[in-house]
Amino acid sequence: QGYSSAASDVYKRQGIFFGLPTQATCNGLYDRLYEWASSVSDETVNAIRLAHGGANYNKNYQQQVIQGKTYVYEEEIDSSVYVHPWFQGNKKALLADFVIGTVDQFLMASLRRKHFMLRHLGLSGKVVIIDECHAYDAYMNQYLEQSIEWMAGYGVPVILLSATLPLSRRKELVNRYIKGIRRNRPKIEKQKPTVSSDWMDNISYPLLT
């Protein structure tokens, strides 16, 4: 929460996407994200979305869905964070301000399919957090790397969480993000690095890259 808040402040982002490996972990963290989002949304009204195939079976989430005819900006609601039915469709899931969902919601940003630009639009204004990034197979890693490159091109801060990510894999992911930045901002290629790269070979734990 501290890292995401700092990134939101620095990059002036308007929300968070939190990608987790399973529906169970999403459900377990949903209430915590809702509580945190409410604490940082005192002066604004924001939408939250639980994005996975079993979201309709989460009782807490369904109890927070406001009625379709409720006009949030005209009628007083109990919380500064709400679940609006407009965001319930798969196409518009990532357009909510705060989204917690299975990691495939993020990986599909690199899958050519209908309405994929709505997914890019939803992610482009957020801080992206991906948990357990060491646990994916070779197939998922290809989509992870490509999605990270897309986010770098949009200037989206990406936070990857892992307790056991190998040094070599960390370098690959960081270099892929750098590639996305340089592809969209060619002048960066000519700039000299201003920060020491010693951390690239650092194996201490915990490590913030």
Regions found by a protein language model. Give the residues of each.
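Conserved Walker A/P-loop ATP-binding site and its immediately adjacent core
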Residues: 15-36, 52-55, 169
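Conserved helicase/translocase P-loop NTPase motor core
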Residues: 91-122, 126, 143
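SF2 helicase catalytic motif II
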Residues: 119-144, 149
